[in-house]
Regions:
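Flavin-dependent oxidoreductase catalytic cores
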Residues: 2, 11, 70-97, 107, ...
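Non-catalytic positions within long, well-ordered alpha-helices that form the structural scaffold/packing
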Residues: 50-51, 117, 181-182
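Active-site beta-loop-alpha junctions enriched in small/polar residues
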Residues: 16-23, 61-65, 97-102, 129-132, ...
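N-terminal amphipathic alpha-helix/helix-capping segment at the start of soluble metabolic enzymes
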Residues: 1-18, 22-35, 87
């Protein structure tokens, strides 16, 4: 099994699986059905991904919506079981995401970290709240990084690889990334990318800030997802993903709607190539990775097509 932390300097390739959208009700029949659905999904996805030996890790996000007061509504369940199950079937490592903003106390967060580590999951993406306008009960991301490092030392935990999210379009993002790196981030996962201008500018600025601060930059994992139709736009809007008009027209407004996913894959490959070419001159010290996301359940075949193309590309490196 490839160690995920060790792979961070060698173009890691990740696949992100959408979690099961459900919640436990206390009804034994319903809750048992959830477990069976998880087990079936583990076997189905594992079989689908078995043809990609170059895959480094399986990532599963946590789906959380917030109301107008910032209170959470959890829309996913058994994310650790899903990630661990698929990873074990494939002989890969699991990555799990956790929204830390809604943790009620230090003890609650510490308990979650300890439980996650005890389940053999040592790669964690710590995620903040949706907006700066709410006063959240939990730690911010840098604080969560520091708490995790503290628990590793005081509880004698395995070496946990800490990830955070970066939003290329957000103002001041390079500075935030620097602070999160200093507080313990080993890697960043970007929001889904459909153009390269914002991320190349961000990587250049982040590299310069790290150099001035004498800090080794974290690996930045670039996220991509295929689009199959205009129906995907609502989800992108909900996720806050920027899809430039020119790119939207190219992928989705073409006469051959059935070929939208192919144009989407080509666009992603072109964006990655542009970033990698820019890296040579402007941020050679920053290691890059690739994350292919399953945007929806029906997009899975197209996500696999995209993964196949990136898999071929990484094998050539």
């Amino acid at each position: 099994m490839v160690n995920f932390k060790e792979s961070l300097n060698n173009l890691p390739l990740i696949f992100t699986v959408i979690p099961l959208r459900d919640s436990k009700t206390g009804d034994p029949e319903h809750d048992n059905r959830i477990v069976k659905n998880i087990e079936a999904r583990i076997m189905d996805i594992s079989k689908t991904l078995s043809d990609f030996p170059g895959l480094t890790a399986i990532n599963v996000p946590e789906l959380v919506e917030e109301n107008h007061e910032g209170k959470p509504r959890y829309n996913s369940i058994f994310t650790r079981k899903l990630a661990r199950g698929i990873a074990d079937q494939l002989g890969k490592e699991a990555i799990i995401n956790k929204v830390v903003a809604h943790m009620e106390s230090y003890d609650e967060f510490a308990k979650w970290i300890l439980e996650t580590e005890s389940q053999g999951i040592r790669n964690i993406v710590l995620v903040g709240g949706n907006t700066r306008h709410h006063r959240y009960t939990g730690p911010n991301v840098s604080e969560a990084n520091l708490i995790t490092k503290h628990l590793m030392k005081t509880k004698n935990l395995s070496d946990i690889t800490i990830g955070n999210i970066c939003l290329p379009e957000r103002g001041g993002e390079a500075r935030r990334m620097l602070y999160k790196t200093i507080s313990g981030a080993d890697f960043f996962t970007t929001q889904m990318l459909f153009e390269g201008d914002h991320i190349t500018h961000l990587l250049k600025e982040y590299g310069e800030l790290c150099s001035k601060a004498q800090v080794n930059p974290a690996t930045v994992i670039l996220s991509f997802a295929p689009l199959k139709s205009v129906a995907d736009l609502n989800l992108l809007d909900f996720l806050g993903v920027d899809l430039p008009d020119e790119t939207k027209d190219y992928i989705l407004e073409n006469e051959q709607v059935s070929k939208a996913y192919k144009r989407s894959i080509k666009n992603a490959l072109d964006v990655l190539k542009a970033i990698m070419n820019d890296k040579i001159d402007n941020y050679p010290e920053i290691n890059i990775g690739i994350n292919v996301e399953q945007l929806t359940k029906s997009n899975m075949p197209y996500s696999i097509e995209m993964l196949k193309e990136f898999h071929i590309m990484t094998k050539k490196k």
